[in-house]
From Swiss-Prot:
The lineage of its organism: Bacteria, Pseudomonadati, Bacteroidota, Flavobacteriia, Flavobacteriales. This is Flavastacin. Keywords: Glycoprotein, Hydrolase, Lectin, Metal-binding, Metalloprotease, Protease, Signal, Zinc, Zymogen. The keyword Metal-binding applies. Residues 16-91 form a propeptide. Residues 1-15 form the signal peptide. Glycans are attached at S355.
Length: 443
């Protein structure tokens, strides 16, 4: 992170604090991706889905926000998203791979070395890292386990600022930098970025709750107000979230705040602990999607089209090839399913009628409108489903054999016996209502 949070003095120090006259415009590669220079920082401005996303590049490191770093691969994915000519298939693939959560809701870690810290300061740092772990895990399913030989894990370093990589990436070590070693909640804030959690003010529905005027933000800080359309906010907008910034953060003039409530009033921030909304969001993100097989439980899948219609196995039959349909909600086992992890991100969806039978794309089809059926589990790609956490909108499902398609209610109908199929989408970031489902745990 390029800033220090000095809680006691209330002072916000920015490394990027020069005036506009220091900016030098460089040739743009396209209207969808322009770059400017600011004191050794390359500011990338990307037009994605009609909104601008900013990424700051400093010495080959990419900052998605002041305290969020992304890999070169993730940055290149954003650049591809800024290309209006990419196919729906590629766009869908990018969305599904940009941010990943930790497998089995388990975050492996190593503790920092003492470095330049005094013995007392070092012991305080270690104590507060463990307090941050406890703060997160006390009311969630997430576990923090000290690393033995795992390839992916988080590390901590005392630094001049706070920052963390974004989410889990295969074969990557997430190096978390901490300046505020005496504040467990700030350490938790950065750990949550490594868990794949964004800032509250950047959720896609923020305009329903706050006004953001980035013209009031200091040069080089607009990336802190990116709208994360691929990030799903859960619950009501949470002004008390540990992931929320205050009105005047990054403001040129504190009397002209970057953010206000809709009525024009300002708000502060807290770094004392996680809010109830933070815990609810983590539990949704790391709920059935990332739980271990022992704790997945049994769920119903309700369409977002109608709260009283569930995915159903026709006639409660367990014969191979049985149609999967929409039907009025009941308490029958024909509407209950068990999620079992197949590989990271992918799950099989088993019928409680017969746990050897799973939801399957018929004949391994990849065409729009291909039916979904019940069939004996053969561990094929047509039986593995990538789950998209859509926050308040529930979940979306993409079959591994056809990753650009989504599980959907055919034609968006809500009549009984409507087939469940896989269908194309032009709205990979905001899926059609017919492609959204709520998972409700029934035991």
């Amino acid at each position: 992170m390029t800033r220090k949070l000095l809680i006691l003095s209330g002072c916000l120090i920015l490394a990027l604090n020069s005036c506009k006259s220091d900016m030098e415009t460089t040739p743009a590669s396209s209207v969808d991706h322009t770059t400017t220079q600011l004191n050794g920082t390359t500011i990338h401005k990307l037009l994605i889905n009609g909104a601008y996303t900013y990424v700051n590049e400093v010495n080959g490191e990419y900052f998605y926000a002041d305290d969020i770093t992304i890999t070169a691969e993730q940055f290149n994915q954003l650049k591809r998203m800024a290309n209006p000519d990419i196919s729906t298939v590629e766009r869908s693939t990018i969305v599904s791979s940009f941010i990943k959560t930790w497998p089995n809701a388990t975050v492996y870690y190593t503790l920092p070395s003492q470095g330049s810290l005094s013995t007392q300061a070092y012991n305080t740092f270690l104590t507060n890292i463990n307090k941050a772990f406890d703060m997160i895990s006390s009311k969630t399913s997430v576990k923090f386990v000290q690393r033995t030989n795992q390839t992916e894990y988080i590390t901590f370093t005392y630094s001049t600022g706070n920052s963390s990589p974004l989410g889990w990436v295969k074969n990557r070590v997430n190096g978390i930098k901490i300046y505020n070693t005496t504040y467990p909640a700030i350490i938790a804030h950065e750990i949550m970025h490594s868990m794949g959690i964004m800032h509250e003010q950047c959720r896609p529905d923020r305009d329903q709750y706050i006004i953001v005027d980035t013209n009031r933000a200091q040069d080089g800080t607009r990336h802190n107000f990116n709208l994360y359309n691929d990030y799903a906010g859960h619950g009501e907008f949470d002004f008390g979230s540990v992931m929320m910034y205050k009105s005047t953060d990054f403001a040129i003039d504190p009397n002209l705040p970057v953010m206000t409530k809709l009525d024009g009033s300002t708000f502060g921030k807290q770094r004392d602990g996680l809010s109830a909304g933070d815990y609810a969001g983590i539990n949704h993100l790391y709920g059935p999607v990332n739980s271990t097989s022992a704790t997945n439980g049994t769920y119903t899948l309700t369409t977002s089209l109608a709260g009283d219609k569930n995915i159903d196995i026709t006639g409660s039959s367990t014969a191979d090839g049985t149609d999967v349909i929409l039907y009025s909600a009941t308490t029958g086992n024909n509407q209950k399913f068990i999620f079992r992890k197949s590989e990271h991100g992918y799950f099989t969806i088993k019928s409680i009628l017969d746990s050897t039978k799973v939801l399957t794309v018929r004949n391994n089809g990849t065409a729009n409108g291909t039916a979904v059926e019940l069939r004996t589990n053969a561990d094929t790609d047509a039986q593995k489903w990538l789950l998209f956490n859509l926050g308040n909108e529930g979940f979306g499902f993409a079959p591994k054999n056809a990753p650009s398609l989504r599980l959907e209610v055919k034609d968006g109908l809500t009549t009984n016996l409507t087939p469940i199929v896989i269908g194309s989408t032009d709205q990979t970031l905001q899926p059609y209502t017919k492609q959204r489902f709520t998972l409700t745990k029934v035991n």
